[in-house]
């Protein structure tokens, strides 16, 4: 009875949560009765803690509504339900014959393999050991991405296959790819994990065709345990590469081998890529990596300074983080310049010193992002009139873009709430605060608003 009610509870959660939240936290759970207790099994500690912290009240409320005082007790555990452990697993799809020990590749490509031991080393050589989960600075902007990546590292080929990470440049997607690779190799040193840029895949295929080595190319890519491809959007308009990757993708998934892809945009928005590929990109889990919010930018600067052996005052970190907002790479580059100048001049790192060291960068940023620029960009994006930003109209088609513009002004400029309100037709600062909170809430609940906000930040920060 309780287990069947759990299926109904899943339906309730699917209605109340976003598709991404449901896929990441609820779908992996398994349920089984143990006496008068319903045990929910999570695949790992991270999922267990998250569900218990975020969703336990919704689950308890549902069971109380349905069963009253007869509602079962709830307990969480890690692993799979005992009854499932006794079931013989279905045989994995046959893996393509690698032929590593018989065939020597004829070209100097990623698949130039002579023997199996060398193959293992070759597969792992491009996973950067410096990129770990421990040194990935987590914030609201990348929390789901990191959580999904950690689960893939623990259970490659499992629930999130493929995992598709998308967002602007310099936001940490590549860091997460390497962190997953390092996690997989730590758990299984013999795992064949390949990371590459999409252009490398194209180059390998072209060389294979030129050297009549296409079969070796296929064997190589279809025999790996995990394939991570960065910037998949560069497959656009490369028909033969897309054709080969389509078959590689299918072969890997049939064998339960992990695939992770990254792009600068949502899968369906990638122009020049076949629909059948874009559809497959969304088969697993798709997660947005957004520009870091202020607190995360500060944490990134403090972590980088600590790694460099530099004492960075809090007020300096906040000064830089409030002015440089586009991506992690820009933040780290700015800090490197500050550190180099400090080492060269012997001067202490103060706000005045940073203002001088980053003069050109700060001037460019302040010139690019203004409230007026934000209003024009948002109005154009939503196809409304610029005058609507200042008007008193309250229809959703106008009010929602106006709220988005206010939230962006709060995040991307140094203007105070009253100053932002003045720029939007003399509105009160409480109106701006309400808009910021409303958009923050909608970014959690609405995929469309989340996408719009991320797209606008990329446009304004480029």
Curated annotation (Swiss-Prot):
Q: Where does ATP bind?
A: 170, 172-174
Q: Which GO terms describe its cellular component?
A: cytoplasm; plasma membrane
Pfam family name, one: Bac_DnaA
What are the boundaries of the region Domain I, interacts with DnaA modulators?
A: 1-84
Annotated region (Domain IV, binds dsDNA), positions in chain: 343-462
Asked if the Swiss-Prot or TrEMBL record annotates the protein with the keyword Cell cycle, the reply is no
Main site of residence? cytoplasm
List, alphabetically, the SMART domains matched: AAA, Bac_DnaA_C
List the InterPro entries hit by this protein, alphabetically: AAA+_ATPase (IPR003593), Chromosome_initiator_DnaA (IPR001957), Chromosome_initiator_DnaA-like (IPR020591), Chromosome_initiator_DnaA_CS (IPR018312), DnaA_C (IPR013159), DnaA_dom (IPR013317), DnaA_N_dom (IPR024633), DnaA_N_sf (IPR038454)
- Key words, A-Z: ATP-binding, Cytoplasm, DNA replication, DNA-binding, Lipid-binding, Nucleotide-binding
Region annotation (Domain III, AAA+ region) maps to 126-342
Residue span of region Domain II: 84-125
Q: List the disulfide bonds.
A: none
| An example Gene Ontology biological process | regulation of DNA replication
| Compartment(s) | Cytoplasm
Q: Which domain of life is it from?
A: Bacteria
User: Partners and quaternary state?
Assistant: Oligomerizes as a right-handed, spiral filament on DNA at oriC.
Regarding domains, what does the record say?
Domain I is involved in oligomerization and binding regulators, domain II is flexibile and of varying length in different bacteria, domain III forms the AAA+ region, while domain IV binds dsDNA.
What does the record give as the function of this protein?
Plays an essential role in the initiation and regulation of chromosomal replication. ATP-DnaA binds to the origin of replication (oriC) to initiate formation of the DNA replication initiation complex once per cell cycle. Binds the DnaA box (a 9 base pair repeat at the origin) and separates the double-stranded (ds)DNA. Forms a right-handed helical filament on oriC DNA; dsDNA binds to the exterior of the filament while single-stranded (ss)DNA is stabiized in the filament's interior.
Q: Which NCBIfam families match?
A: DnaA (TIGR00362)
Q: What is this protein called?
A: Chromosomal replication initiator protein DnaA
Q: Which organism is it from?
A: Shewanella denitrificans (strain OS217 / ATCC BAA-1090 / DSM 15013)
- Output the lineage of the source organism: Bacteria, Pseudomonadati, Pseudomonadota, Gammaproteobacteria, Alteromonadales
């Amino acid at each position: 009875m309780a287990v069947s009610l759990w299926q109904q509870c899943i339906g309730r959660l699917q209605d109340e949560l976003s598709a991404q939240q449901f896929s990441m936290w609820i779908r992996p759970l398994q349920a089984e009765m143990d006496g008068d207790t319903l045990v929910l099994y999570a695949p790992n500690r991270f999922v267990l803690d998250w569900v218990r912290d975020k969703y336990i009240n919704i689950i308890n409320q549902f069971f109380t509504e349905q069963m009253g005082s007869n509602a079962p007790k709830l307990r969480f555990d890690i692993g799979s339900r005992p009854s499932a452990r006794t079931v013989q697993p279905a045989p994995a799809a046959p893996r393509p014959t690698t032929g590593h020990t018989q065939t020597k590749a004829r070209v100097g490509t990623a698949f130039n393999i002579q023997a199996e031991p060398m193959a293992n080393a070759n597969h792992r050589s491009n996973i950067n050991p410096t990129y770990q989960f421990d040194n990935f600075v987590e914030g609201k902007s990348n929390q789901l991405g990191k959580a999904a990546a950690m689960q893939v590292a623990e259970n490659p080929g499992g629930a999130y296959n493929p995992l598709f990470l998308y967002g602007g440049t310099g936001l940490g997607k590549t860091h997460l790819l390497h962190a997953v690779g390092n996690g997989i190799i730590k758990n299984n040193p013999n795992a064949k994990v390949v990371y590459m840029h999409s252009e490398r895949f194209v180059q390998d295929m072209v060389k294979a065709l030129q050297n009549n080595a296409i079969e070796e190319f296929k064997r190589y890519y279809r025999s790996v345990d995990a394939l991570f491809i960065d910037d998949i959007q560069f497959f656009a308009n490369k028909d033969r590469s897309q054709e080969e990757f389509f078959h590689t993708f299918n072969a890997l998934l049939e064998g339960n081998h992990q695939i992770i892809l990254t792009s600068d945009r949502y899968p369906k928005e990638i122009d020049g890529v076949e629909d059948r590929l874009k559809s497959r990109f969304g088969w697993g889990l798709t997660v947005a990596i957004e520009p870091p919010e202020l607190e995360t930018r500060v944490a990134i600067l403090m972590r980088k300074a600590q790694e460099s052996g530099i004492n960075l005052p809090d007020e300096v970190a906040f000064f830089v983080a409030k002015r440089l907002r586009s991506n992690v790479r820009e933040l780290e580059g700015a800090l490197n310049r500050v550190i180099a100048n400090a080492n060269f001049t012997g001067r202490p790192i103060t706000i005045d010193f940073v203002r001088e060291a980053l003069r050109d960068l700060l001037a460019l940023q302040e010139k690019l992002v203004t409230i007026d620029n934000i209003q024009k960009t948002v109005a154009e994006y939503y196809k409304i009139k610029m005058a609507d930003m200042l008007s008193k109209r309250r229809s959703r088609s106008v009010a929602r873009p106006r709220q988005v513009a206010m939230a962006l002004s709060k995040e991307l400029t140094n203007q105070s709430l009253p100053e932002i309100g003045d720029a939007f037709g003399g509105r009160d600062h409480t109106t701006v605060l309400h808009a910021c909170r409303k958009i923050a809430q909608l970014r959690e609940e609405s995929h469309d608003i989340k996408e719009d906000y991320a797209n606008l930040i990329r446009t304004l920060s480029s």
